[in-house]
Amino acid sequence: MVRAGAVGTHLPTSSLDIFGDLRKMNKRQLYYQVLNFAMIVSSALMIWKGLIVLTGSESPIVVVLSGSMEPAFHRGDLLFLTNFREDPIRAGEIVVFKVEGRDIPIVHRVIKVHEKDNGDIKFLTKGDNNEVDDRGLYKEGQNWLEKKDVVGRARGFLPYVGMVTIIMNDYPKFKYALLAVMGAYVLLKRES
């Protein structure tokens, strides 16, 4: 059963109607919708790769996953990063870094910087809301971070926008349902 909508649209009332709509499409319409979906996915990937090149960061957008940086950033804030190698690292700067043996990058503030005569830089980080520095988070035997450990430096943020990502990771069924709805929408959307 299909409810009436705006001119040129229709709204399926059950998940079975979605499959019925797919069966009603001729091959040409189905290929067009699949191609449309593929173009959306490839456009998103091209935009992401373009951001990587423009920002110099392997991950130009990250979500704050804990409260360790409060009050500066809260859980769910979306951070925009850059990572230009020629920019010096300074105390007070907020960096995102990876630690060997951990999959998820950490967002913390640089509290100490040591620069050697040969130009090598080592630095120490700490979460604003943490009591102690991050030496306990670094790999065993590592007391300082180096520039190679930095994924990016925070240049801007959107508050709480990343909560969607956190919810999707905490509730995988929600993530798959959302992806299925979006995929069905793209496949079933008809040009008017």
Swiss-Prot record:
It catalyses: Cleavage of hydrophobic, N-terminal signal or leader sequences from secreted and periplasmic proteins. Its main location: endoplasmic reticulum. The keyword Hydrolase applies. Residues 1-28 are cytoplasmic. The C-terminal short (CTS) helix is essential for catalytic activity. It may be accommodated as a transmembrane helix in the thinned membrane environment of the complex, similarly to the signal peptide in the complex substrates. It comes from the Eukaryota. It is found in: Endoplasmic reticulum membrane. May undergo processing at the N-terminus. The chain crosses the membrane at residues 29-48. Residues 49-192 are lumenal. Keywords: Endoplasmic reticulum, Hydrolase, Membrane, Protease, Signal-anchor, Transmembrane, Transmembrane helix. InterPro entries: LexA/Signal_pep-like_sf (IPR036286), Pept_S26A_signal_pept_1_CS (IPR019758), Pept_S26A_signal_pept_1_Ser-AS (IPR019756), Peptidase_S24_S26A/B/C (IPR015927), Peptidase_S26 (IPR019533), Peptidase_S26B (IPR001733). One of its GO terms (molecular function) is serine-type endopeptidase activity. This is Signal peptidase complex catalytic subunit SEC11C. Its EC number is 3.4.21.89. PANTHER family: SIGNAL PEPTIDASE COMPLEX CATALYTIC SUBUNIT SEC11, SIGNAL PEPTIDASE COMPLEX CATALYTIC SUBUNIT SEC11C. SUPFAM superfamilies: LexA/Signal peptidase. Belongs to the peptidase S26B family. Catalytic component of the signal peptidase complex (SPC) which catalyzes the cleavage of N-terminal signal sequences from nascent proteins as they are translocated into the lumen of the endoplasmic reticulum. Specifically cleaves N-terminal signal peptides that contain a hydrophobic alpha-helix (h-region) shorter than 18-20 amino acids. The active site is at S68 (charge relay system), H108 (charge relay system), D134 (charge relay system). Gene3D superfamilies: Umud Fragment, subunit A. Residues 177-188 are annotated as: C-terminal short (CTS) helix. Component of the signal peptidase complex paralog C (SPC-C) composed of a catalytic subunit SEC11C and three accessory subunits SPCS1, SPCS2 and SPCS3. Within the complex, interacts with SPCS2 and SPCS3. The complex induces a local thinning of the ER membrane which is used to measure the length of the signal peptide (SP) h-region of protein substrates. This ensures the selectivity of the complex towards h-regions shorter than 18-20 amino acids. One of its GO terms (biological process) is signal peptide processing. GO terms for cellular component: signal peptidase complex.
